[in-house]
């Protein structure tokens, strides 16, 4: 009997500690998402935008598929994330299958042959597409995190 009481006490303490850790993690992720969203809106650098997007995707990966998920919206976001990753994946400094960095790299290599407005348009495309992705994931996760 004494053992059962001690065991239940230990389990209760562990349960409380785990619950608080989960709440702290949720708060930390929520705060980080807010910071990343602000940085995404303020940044004018394509590389920074891509870095922010990958960090937001990492947070999204932690929470997707959990209870209270909107299956249709997650399917749309998963499609956007996979498309983004496919276009921006870099392996050993080399873009996989060209992608966005292939376009930007080709533009940078042929900088003298490509008009400045075309280079600027390509960079603006990268920045705007990453901002849209970050905003979509941010809106979805913030709505989902409010439920907890």
From Swiss-Prot:
ATP-binding among keywords: no
Keywords: Immunity, Innate immunity, Secreted, Signal
Localization per Swiss-Prot or TrEMBL: Secreted
A single BP term in Gene Ontology: innate immune response
Pfam families, alphabetized: Turandot
InterPro entries, sorted: Turandot
Top-level taxon: Eukaryota
Keyword Signal (UniProt): yes
Leader sequence segment: 1-23
Gene Ontology CC annotations of this record: extracellular space
Any coiled-coil regions, as ranges: none
Role noted for this protein: A humoral factor that may play a role in stress tolerance.
Similarity section: Belongs to the Turandot family.
Listed name of the protein: Protein Turandot Z
Lineage summary: Eukaryota, Metazoa, Ecdysozoa, Arthropoda, Hexapoda
Gene: TotZ
């Amino acid at each position: 009997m004494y053992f059962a009481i001690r065991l239940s006490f230990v389990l209760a303490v562990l349960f409380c500690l785990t619950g608080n850790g989960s709440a702290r993690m949720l708060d930390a992720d929520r705060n980080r998402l807010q910071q990343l969203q602000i940085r995404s809106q303020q940044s004018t650098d394509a590389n920074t935008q891509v870095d922010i997007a990958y960090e937001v995707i990492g947070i999204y990966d932690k929470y997707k598929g959990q209870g209270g998920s909107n299956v249709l919206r997650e399917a749309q976001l998963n499609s956007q994330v996979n498309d983004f990753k496919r276009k921006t994946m870099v392996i050993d400094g080399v873009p996989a299958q060209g992608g966005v960095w292939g376009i930007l790299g080709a533009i940078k290599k042929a900088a003298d042959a490509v008009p400045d407005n075309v280079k600027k348009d390509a960079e603006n495309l990268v920045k705007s597409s990453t901002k849209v992705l970050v905003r979509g994931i941010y809106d979805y996760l913030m709505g989902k995190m409010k439920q907890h």
